[in-house]
Amino acid sequence: VEIKGLNHRIFPWVLELVSRGLNVYLCGPSGSGKTTLAKRTAEALKLPFYYTGAILQKYELLGYMDANGNYISTSFYNCYKHGGLYLWDEIDASNPGALVAFNAALENGLLAAPNGEMVEIHPDFKCIAAANTIGKGSTQKHAGRQPIDGAVTERYAFVQMDYDWQLTAAIAQIDFDGEEKPIDYKVKRSYAQADYDKYFADVQAWS
């Protein structure tokens, strides 16, 4: 695993979770860096990065057959079959039917594609879901969000993500008082293995 450049303070946790084969659910406000964090995780693991926004129709997840009988694949299909890190952004604004199909593919290790192909999950398939809510439905700030079935959410390790002002200051090269910094300011944070083990023990307890 190779980590380069500036990263959000929770990046080491997310990287460790994904490295251990856990699906991660990133919950945080807009602009907190969820997509960037997922990209950096893929880079650190040297995996291709695949992205999907809110899925409103099931075919957007699984693909479809066109008028000429050709299968039109999707990011999920390609990542599931060939390996990589798949980010499903705004999963809480997506179609419940697509979530059921997605969960079945994760649980069974098989994907029934519309072209009749039965695809086995690639050993290097990794998954991060990102949302503004915890999957309990709409909030005062985020209307139109869907409650996510417990059969789906129980397959994820939930990680709360907020703005990292140190990272913001580092990118802008300013101190928190707004003064310009003449040198690069790199945010570094490390965790002992004991801390990781305690966290993953907690994750197992939530399951």
Protein language model features and the residues they cover:
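C-terminal regulatory/interaction module of P-loop NTP-utilizing enzymes
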Residues: 1-207
